[in-house]
Amino acid sequence: HTATTRTSTAAPAPSDATVTTRHTLRTASGELPYTATTGRIVLREEVYDDGVFQGTRAKAEVFLTAYTADDADPTTRPVAFVFNGGPGSASLWLHLGLLGPRRVLAGDAGEPAAPPYALVDNAESLLAHTDLVFIDPMSTGYTRAAEGQKPGDYHGYAGDISAIGELIRLWTSRQSRWLSPKFVIGESYGTLRGAALAEHLQGPLGMYLNGLVLISSVLDLSSIDFENQRNDRAHALYLPFYAATAHRHGKHPGRSRDDVLAEAQEYADRDYPWVLSRGSRLTAAERADAVATLARLTGLSEEYVDRADLRIEHWRYFGELLRAERRTVGRLDSRFTGPAASAIAEEMDADPSFDAI
């Protein structure tokens, strides 16, 4: 008889996999030697069967990139944990676009970068002041659920915060940084995540932050909700942005941007919310005055503002401001403009600022 040997096809248990390199950043205050560590950190959970501990199993593999200054005192050198928003965005935008020691040479409005694209030293990197740990939330970048786990468990508010909090705890413990000043930096939805993380870290994990940095803050999602017709806050809050955008594109000749913004902010703070709350109770004169004011500030026609019932939805604004020139305005950065595919589209059909990134 011939014996047969069965070979297990089960995948090996995941383990941390990181790569470390060393570099030097040239800043305004001199050269800064630093260490870069990137890769996946495995998050694990305890397993019990009928109350009996069975060990641990992997639940997620979280991707991070950490930059730490060499020869720094960890009790005084801060560390900042950084992520973008979405939800659903990796951290590469803040990493390679703003805070990291290297950044994409991206050009600017009217001067887009041409291929071949390049990375350059970022002399204004926050690494000159704090160590940086860039984190990709679940299903973004290279972060994935472990085999047999459901990524959806981490896509919600609570699961997202729990996973990132656990990653921060692990990194802090393994790098002996509990005594370091600690900060969280979030962008857009990441500001809401950051605020929730501060409570989560302080509560279950016993880690106290020294500060939060909120970029493009949106702690109250109703402040950007244009779809709820009973919510007028977004219309008032966006008015100064519309006014600044209109000024950028020549709709306020002879006026300074600060002057235009001051008027828009004053109107958005006081008269505009009152006007919107009055609805059909506005007199003809009050409505006409509001239409004229909004048209002047936003750069739109009085006819459009009146048809919009004094409420200017942001996607429509980007498509309407330069409609006569058959161009759209950027949403992420309203200095950018691009050709409109349609001259009759209800709202912008593409974001020229996003396309330029």
Region annotations inferred by a language model:
Residues T2-R6, Y48-D153:
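N-terminal cap/lid subdomain of alpha/beta-hydrolase-fold enzymes
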Residues A13-D71:
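N-terminal cap/lid segment of alpha/beta-hydrolase-fold proteins
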Residues E46-Y48, L105-R177, S223-I224, D232-A236, ...:
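Active-site-proximal cap/loop segments of hydrolase catalytic domains
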Residues S176-Y189:
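Alpha/beta-hydrolase fold nucleophile elbow
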Residues G279-I357:
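Alpha/beta-hydrolase fold catalytic core
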